[in-house]
């Protein structure tokens, strides 16, 4: 796909979007209508930070970890590479060694394992902890996945989360990659300026380089 246009790789946020079991359902409503106010519609948004396309801050899994405003926003803007890792139960150093990743700073993984934003998956391919030092050696500072988590859905240890941030690698989850080709792109996936938050929704977009 060659285009000069930005391509949206975010899950649209609407009242049908899937959320983590037990987490806050997404809701948008007009809480103050133009008829009531006399001039404007005012919307009310209720959601979990980890709904749809979002980033994780270390505070999400570490009480002493950095929060969103502590993160380097430069990481979320710049050249990125998309690669296909479909049909794998887990992804680690072994699976990525065959790819040429020298000079890559941001890496998005297409697993094509779950494409329904309105259904929460029962199982996902996850990242193994040994991926973190491998990515760090390559100079990669951000990893993105097209599933809700880098760890197994029922996992409590969150080894991949911990090891990735230990090695200076930021996490982007629930990107939508089924409609874009492998290759090099410019990425913008900026978090909101949420002072004390453990993560943030993002509008992730890419443009071919």
From Swiss-Prot:
Note accompanying the cofactor annotation: Binds 2 zinc ions per subunit.
Residues the entry annotates as binding substrate: 20
Gene Ontology BP annotations: anthranilate metabolic process; L-tryptophan catabolic process to kynurenine
Ligand binding (Zn(2+) 2): 56, 161, 173
Molecular function terms, GO-annotated: arylformamidase activity; formamidase activity; zinc ion binding
Cofactor requirement: Zn(2+)
Pathway assigned in UniProt: Amino-acid degradation; L-tryptophan degradation via kynurenine pathway; L-kynurenine from L-tryptophan: step 2/2
Active site: 60
Top-level taxon of the source organism: Bacteria
Job of this protein: Catalyzes the hydrolysis of N-formyl-L-kynurenine to L-kynurenine, the second step in the kynurenine pathway of tryptophan degradation.
Protein name: Kynurenine formamidase
The encoding gene: kynB
